[in-house]
Structures are given as C-alpha cells and as structure tokens.
Amino acid sequence: PSAGQGPGGGGLPTYPPPQFGGCGVGGTYGTPSTFTSLLSFFGGSGGGGQNGYPGSTSVSGSSGGGGGGAILIASSTRITVAGAIQANGGRGGTASNLTVLTAGSGSGGAIRLVAPEIAGSGSLVARSEAIGCEAGSPGVIRLETSRGLFSGTTNPVASVSTTMSPVAPGS
C-alpha cells in the first residue's frame, strides 16, 4: 500500500486507529468566486493510503487514489467543448475482505481554458471519483474569455474572467 500520487499525497495510518470517529473532510483549494487567476496551477493531491490490520493475513492495506491532472487548453481564436474534459482524482483502494476500510481518494485536478471565445455544450469536470468519507476535495476550473458562449456544465462551478492571462510557464 502507498499514499496516492500528486502533490500532498497522504500518509499511511495504522488500523485500527486508537478511536473510531466520523469522516475527515477534504479542504477546498480556494473559493471559486474569488479566483483571480489560475496561472500556477497543479494537479490534485493524492489520497492517503491505508495499512492493513497488524498481524492479520486476511486484511491487507490499500493505496490512496492519484490526484487529478492539470489541463490547459489555449487558443488564439476559439475553443468549442463538445464532449467531456475531465481532471478527476482516482478512487482509493479498499482493504481486502472489508468494505468499510478504504484508503483516501485523490482530489480533483485543475482545468483552465483560455481563448477569445469559449463555446459548446459539453462538460468540464475536476472532482474526486469517490463520495462520502473517502472522497477527495474538488478541483478547480477556470474559463478566461472575452466572449463566453459556453452553455455546458462544470463540476465544480467554474470561475470566469474576461481577462485572459498569459499561458506560458513562469509568465
């Protein structure tokens, strides 16, 4: 078993923990309505791995899910989203012979579209593949366009700017 891949991949807790409690909740990378730029964006963090029950040969550990990737699509004219663009975090593994002992899933990644016109009715998704206790945090989606004609869906809600920032690394 191992921690999930991506920046901030979690560690390997032991089982059983000293006490059982509620679920941990992943944090959010900023607030969609307050994003002013997404220049230095990264993929999502990996989920925490889970060790098996010490001394048991029937309960092995499981690995955390990988974090979602970072996708940048830029055009000097137009981007049309007709299908699905996804940067989802992977689901954490489940310990053998158990259904309740699950490693953490990776958080969603980042999607950034930059063009004078963004259109289409497709979907943009940057979320964790899991729900409930083992879910990772949502990712981020940013649309930078002077003419937004995109009528599709985003999960999580995208931040939108009419100012197109530089797309070159380090700029």
What are the residue ranges of the model-derived segments?
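Extracellular/surface-exposed low-complexity segments
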Residues: S137-S171
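Glycine-centric low-complexity/flexibility signal
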Residues: P1-R112, P116-S121, A126-G139
